[in-house]
Amino acid sequence: PGAPSSTEPEFTVVTIYNIQYTTAENGASPLVGEQVQTTGIVTGVDRLGTNSAFTIQSGSGAWTGIYCWWAADDGVVVGDEVTVRGTVTEYAASTGDANLSMTELVAGSIVSVNSSGNTLPQPVTLDVEDVGQEMYEGVLVTTTGRVVEAAVCDSDEPNYNYCEWRISNNLDASMMADTVSVNDRFAVTTPALGTIATVTGPLNQWSGSSNSGPSW
């Protein structure tokens, strides 16, 4: 008889660029549905109860970052370099357009924390109207705009206390294409309307909108 077959799933080792780079009009990854292993530096962390979500990036510039969503808190922190495994998927909010989704790694695990305290990649400086480009999904970016929508805060979960507000390069907040939704990731900032704000953070995108978690 031959060697016993393994029940361990096979993971293809790829770069974040391999996962993210796409020419598809809807921005979908060419690796959707595949189980992959990749490495990057943690640039942002969300913790939702027993769930963990974080963004990792390898290098600077376009196509170098990706959002990871786990069903367990792995305890990673910003500055850790991690090797992760997961399934490539496209996420769109239930009320959004399925053709305007965000590429994620889901149902995954940490293979190793390779090092800690690493310098984060250099943020890409963008005008507000350029933030929504597919190539910057998951990438650390910096942008400056005027606060055109007051902060809405959510403190239902004691371990997920945050506010969201919106900046624009246009005084008309109804022009959504020229605005960025800012999630302050636990900092609970409530800037006054009309304030000029510079925000830096990993960029999330879904339903065609942008959400940047700034560092202050």
Residue ranges and their predicted role:
Residues G2-E10:
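Extracellular fibronectin type III
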Residues F11-W216:
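OB-fold nucleic-acid-binding modules
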